[in-house]
Amino acid sequence: MSLIVYFSSRSGNTHRFVERLGVRSSRIPLEASGALQVREPFVLVTPTYGGGSTKGAVPNPVIRFLNDADNRALIRGVIAAGNSNFGEAFCIAGNIISAKCGVPYLYRFELLGTAEDVGNVRNGMEQFWTRQTQA
């Protein structure tokens, strides 16, 4: 399995989910002064913000990270976290990033995810990267 790049707020839900995957990962910094530069293809894992609105659904640090053309060129897919209380906007950050970056929306999960979500993502990522290397 290849690299996971993720953003997690201070609540740490996305961080805990990625830790449970047990894969190589890099975290997008919370602060604007910190910058992450990737050098290899990755799948992005991001929470959804906005409380049910599409406005502000993608966290600002993720936007800053993807506004770097070198980072954006290496994204291969997106996984989103969210809160089902957001209704139709549940995990909508994944839809937005998928459309803007032209990459597949691979999976979505609620809050910090279940053991089933972790297994689904781990297995799905292995299959995804195998297909990527065969293409």
Swiss-Prot record:
SUPFAM superfamilies xref list: Flavoproteins
One Pfam family hit: Flavodoxin_NdrI
GO biological process, one term: protein modification process
One annotated GO molecular function: FMN binding
Stretches that traverse the bilayer: none
Function noted in UniProt: Probably involved in ribonucleotide reductase function.
NCBIfam families, A to Z: nrdI
Protein name as annotated: Protein NrdI
Lineage start: Bacteria, Pseudomonadati, Pseudomonadota, Alphaproteobacteria, Hyphomicrobiales
